[in-house]
């Protein structure tokens, strides 16, 4: 047993940290596990395999469970994935992996761990370890209605480039509470897969941005942020309506967005 492996007392399973070499193991477990949670964002499930905590449990014969919740922004770890193979106890492995992740968390600066739930089976496992619900994420959809773009006279809207990412990350950090902020690494990943991304400038300084993706199902407004001091001036509305017109002009008649149930300002905007 190596220094990276740990077998808890009385447990039939061994835990170790993952590495990039575990890509095929992770892919197989996530593909076949009857219970699996995968965080919804712009990263792949393999992007954090060399980071901590990212754990795998195994017995003498096979790899049986995964848990990853490494930080991406300061102090915040989202549960990136959790999966358990068929025929092994989900609750017991969750508790085992979670306790190991929790013991690692302080060493990597994690003070808060969150989970974006998409399946109800995971809720009692989280609650059993002290998680509590803080908000809900809701889904809104636009279906092809013509819109008017009204940009404030003092602002300029243009296509985003990779050179804007530092400024975009600064806007994002100031616009959101820590739990909902994204790192420049995450924003770069979002930019790479975006179908349409724009920024708004005032006095040649980026004060707002949006990034949207598209698929056979339609477009999706993946991220939008406005400098707090520039909010309530119509800038966010201009970014949204400009994106709607862009996709409408390309024959895309549906666009979706997710937002928090307690974020009334964004709901009014959308």
Where are these regions (language model features)?
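Acyl-donor-binding surface of acyltransferase catalytic domains
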Residues: 1-7, 73, 85-153
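A short beta-loop-alpha structural element at the N-terminal edge
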Residues: 7-26, 156-168
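Helix-loop element at the rim of GNAT/NAT acetyltransferase active sites that forms part
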Residues: 17, 28-41, 170-182
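Conserved donor-binding loop and adjoining core beta-sheet/short helix segment
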Residues: 41-99, 103, 202, 207-222, ...
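Conserved acetyl-CoA-binding loop-helix of GNAT-fold acetyltransferases
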Residues: 90-103, 226, 232-245, 249, ...
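Conserved hydrophobic beta-strand within the GNAT/NAT acetyltransferase core sheet
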Residues: 113-116, 221, 255-259
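C-terminal "cap" of GNAT-fold acetyltransferases
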Residues: 138-161, 253, 258-264
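Phosphate-binding active sites in nucleotide-utilizing proteins
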Residues: 180-182, 189-202, 206-215
